[in-house]
A protein has these predicted regions:
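Internal helix-loop-helix
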Residues: 15-111
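Generic recognition of long tandem-repeat/solenoid scaffolds
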Residues: 146-149
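Short coil/turn connectors at secondary-structure junctions
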Residues: 106-110, 134-135, 142-144, 160-162, ...
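Short alpha-helical segments and helix-capping/turn motifs at coil-helix boundaries
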Residues: 95-99, 131-133, 151, 168-170
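Beta-sandwich/jelly-roll carbohydrate-recognition scaffolds of carbohydrate-active enzymes
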Residues: 100, 121-138
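Short, surface-exposed, low-complexity cationic segments
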Residues: 2-16, 159-169
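A short, Trp-centered hydrophobic/proline-enriched beta-strand micro-motif
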Residues: 108-121
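A short core secondary-structure module
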Residues: 151, 155-179
Length: 179
């Protein structure tokens, strides 16, 4: 209950017209007002405003609430700032990163992430586990998207967010491509 009220306060701060210049910016695609945490900084001023926006939300919770909506949004903004990293494995990966950043930004998504595999046998990479579906991984690709099977944890904020971004904090090894 307390976390839900704290998040509601953050959304209220972002929606308050008095905070518009700090907390939001116009979507490059639609011109609609969107959260600044999704902005890809192009200037020193953009970066400074992004920091001030995060500081404003941190002040609202006295710095005690982890994984506020700006956290994973910042990851997506970082990915969108450098899509060439994703293009190294295929142009479609860069396009997908940019499209998802745009979608999340323009729909004000509060995202959480799940980034740590279950605590099983950490001496083995994902593809060498006794059951290939212990770690979250792609088991099927369709025109509509991917089908995942398995688990991933450390999804702080998942109970409140719009979607969970599945990723992995551990370095991947050859053979782990599905994970």
């Amino acid at each position: 209950k307390g976390a839900a009220h704290s998040l509601a306060r953050l959304f209220d701060v972002a929606a308050d017209p008095a905070n518009r210049a700090l907390m939001t910016f116009p979507s490059p695609k639609t011109g609609a007002t969107v959260w600044r945490c999704y902005q890809v900084p192009k200037t020193v001023d953009d970066l400074a405003l992004r920091r001030l926006m995060s500081a404003r939300w941190a002040e609202e919770t006295f710095g005690l609430m982890g994984r506020t909506p700006d956290h994973v949004a910042g990851f997506l903004a970082g990915y969108a700032a450098k899509p060439s990293v994703f293009a190294e494995h295929g142009k479609e990966f860069a396009r997908n990163v940019l499209a998802y950043h745009e979608f999340a930004r323009d729909h004000h998504l509060y995202l959480s992430y799940a980034i740590v595999p279950p605590q099983i046998d950490r001496s083995k990479p994902a593809h060498r586990q006794s059951d290939p579906t212990l770690y979250a991984g792609v088991v099927k690709e369709t025109d509509a998207g991917i089908v995942l099977k398995g688990a991933q944890q450390l999804a702080t904020g998942a109970a409140f967010c719009d979607a969970v971004f599945i990723s992995c904090i551990h370095p991947m090894q050859p053979g782990d491509e599905a994970y």
